[in-house]
Regions:
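Gly/Pro-rich hinge or "lid" segments in bacterial periplasmic/extracellular proteins
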Residues: 135, 150, 158-224, 228, ...
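N-terminal lobe/hinge region of extracytoplasmic solute-binding protein
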Residues: 28-78, 192-195
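Extracellular/periplasmic solute-recognition and catalytic clefts
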Residues: 202-213, 230-288, 312
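Extracytoplasmic/peripheral linker and loop segments enriched in polar/acidic and small residues
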Residues: 311, 345-346, 396-413, 433-501, ...
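Surface-exposed binding/hinge segments that line
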Residues: 102-104, 111, 115-178
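Structural transition elements
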Residues: 321-358, 376-381
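Aromatic- and charge-enriched surface segment that lines or borders ligand/interaction sites
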Residues: 72-119, 153, 243, 291
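Alpha-helical secondary-structure segments
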Residues: 100-106, 149-155, 159, 197-198, ...
Length: 525
């Protein structure tokens, strides 16, 4: 009897020890992911998770510097147009080898109009990609081929020095052809979804959490310290903060703007604020009235927005007012600043009132407009402030409409908007990552800009190999975008996170990328 009791106690202690040994990282995510298909993902809620589950030809280190990914090395032809990627041994989380053919399959999906990727423009430097995406060529004419299972050959239209930077975006990730052909659209269901990254899907509870577990088949598995990552949906920033303070989260995706002062005073060592390549803006729907062919109205609304007051009193976290679209800090590029950026408040208001009248509106005949934003406390406060500024200065009647992430994205895609809150986070360190967003017909061009002159400038920049000349062309494009008031830049983002002291291995970076595979949990026992 005594031996049985001792054996039972030992087993219980072993079980308890095993449970304690599991290393779990609990992080919040802004919203429920709209899609876990790499070729269909559009926003940060998807990208954070996909970055944990997949890896492309190129990867990033903890500081978001480019490093080899599935491609352990690559060669570039003398003319800069042919890139040959040599793949390392890698496997899907079900153990099936990842091959060059998986990349060919994925990239063809990305530009196939029948698939409908909104990020197909990332592959436009590849031969025939744009023509295919526009429905004018067969997908098998795309300039990508598998010389063998370990060798991928990519043909570009022009030399593209920033091409490796494009390859960290999810749209370029490989996808498992053997699973997609078997499961069809259901391939992203938790029981079917596999990736080639550090973690694999274990559970997906909609509007609650996504649980990932370490993948033994990832080529760098020996360096991954976490056993499990849990992403919690956290659109309510105050609730997110409460969960963090209660010890239910190790890392927050954001913090409430109105709590910054308190957080600095009480959790200063755990509050991490850092500049990154991101722009908060309001987009006009340029496909229909009242903003189509009405630059005076667009300019009037832009002039009224008091960016300095917004970043001082509402966001209050060190954001910079934005008058151009490209963020400061992009290598080799000086962002464009319009003339009115140097005007005082009074001069801007006088000009805005004159333009508003010329556009046919007045306080007696006010503009009535809908402003769409995705559900988020911080977004709501900025939207309320902008609506009040428009009302006070011009008499504009604004209806605020908030929607959950997936519905919000759909309204933007379908141009079911008048004005909408937008944001763009740079995907690589080049001005092109901001400006090619608005090329005519582009999948992420949700303002509906159709400007041949703008498109021409982007095409010229793509062909220009001299860095200084190329930057000058891109600045002309940004100038055209801003001077035509096709959108309203408001501020440049900072990343804002609360991080528990025992979370190690991450590095502040301008991309705001935090792959879980570099994270360590170092709690005192």
């Amino acid at each position: 009897m005594k031996k049985t009791l001792l054996l039972t106690t030992a087993l219980l202690l072993a079980a308890t020890s095993g449970a304690q040994a599991e290393t779990v990282f609990r992080r919040s995510n802004d919203a429920e992911p709209a899609s876990m298909d790499p070729q269909l993902a559009q926003g940060m809620p998807e990208m954070h998770i996909l970055r944990d589950m997949f890896v492309g030809l190129v990867d990033e280190d903890a500081g978001a510097h480019l490093i080899p990914g599935v491609a352990e090395r690559w060669d570039i032809s003398d003319d800069g147009k042919t890139w040959t990627f040599h793949l390392r041994d890698n496997a899907w989380s079900d153990g099936t080898p990842v091959t060059a053919g998986d990349f060919v399959y994925a990239w063809r999906r990305a530009v196939d109009p029948a698939v409908g990727s909104k990020y197909s423009f990332f592959l436009y430097p590849v031969k025939n990609a744009k023509t295919i995406a526009e429905g004018n060529a067969a997908v098998d004419t795309l300039g990508v081929s598998a010389a063998d299972d370990k060798t991928l050959v990519v043909e570009l239209n022009e030399p593209t020095p920033y091409f490796p930077g494009l390859l960290i975006n999810a749209v370029t990730y490989p996808v498992p052809q053997h699973i997609i052909e078997k499961q069809g659209k259901d391939w992203t269901r938790p029981e079917n979804l596999i990736g080639n990254g550090a973690f694999k899907m274990r559970e997906w509870k909609p509007q609650s959490r996504i649980v990932l577990e370490k993948s033994a088949n990832y080529y760098g598995a020996q360096d991954v310290q976490l056993d499990k990552v849990i992403y919690y949906v956290s659109e309510d920033k105050n609730a997110e903060l409460q969960r963090y303070r209660a010890g239910e989260l190790d890392w927050t995706a954001d913090v409430p703007n109105d709590q910054i002062k308190w957080l600095r005073e009480n959790l200063g060592a755990e509050l991490h604020i850092h500049n990154y390549l991101g722009t908060f803006y309001f987009g006009y729907n340029l496909t229909k009235p009242p903003f189509k062919d009405n630059p005076k109205l667009r300019e009037a609304l832009s002039l009224v927005i008091d960016r300095e007051r917004i970043v001082k009193n509402i966001t209050a976290s060190g954001e910079q007012p934005a008058y151009g679209f490209v963020t400061p800090g992009i290598s080799g590029y000086t962002p464009y600043q319009p003339e009115y950026a140097s005007w005082d408040r009074q001069k801007r208001l006088e000009k805005a009132k004159a333009l508003y009248a010329e556009a046919g509106y007045s306080k007696e005949n006010p503009l009535r407009v809908e402003l769409l934003y995705n559900t988020n406390d911080n977004n709501k406060k900025v939207a309320i402030a902008v609506a009040a500024l428009w009302k006070d200065a011009l008499g504009v009647e604004t209806s605020l409409i908030n929607k959950e992430w997936k519905a919000y994205l759909n309204d933007r895609r379908e141009y079911n908007t008048q004005v909408f809150r937008g944001s763009w986070m740079g995907d690589y360190d080049d001005a092109n990552t901001f400006l090619d967003l608005f090329v005519s017909g582009g999948g992420s061009n949700t303002i509906g800009l159709n400007d041949a002159a703008y498109d021409k400038l982007l095409s010229e920049a793509a062909r220009e190999t001299d860095g200084t000349k190329r930057a000058a062309i891109l600045q002309q494009a940004e100038k055209r975008l801003i001077d035509h008031h096709d959108l309203v830049p408001v501020f440049f983002f900072v990343s804002k996170h609360l991080v528990k002291p025992y979370v190690k291995g991450y590095e502040e970076n301008v991309m705001n990328h935090w792959p879980s595979k570099y994270i360590r949990i170092e709690k005192e026992q």
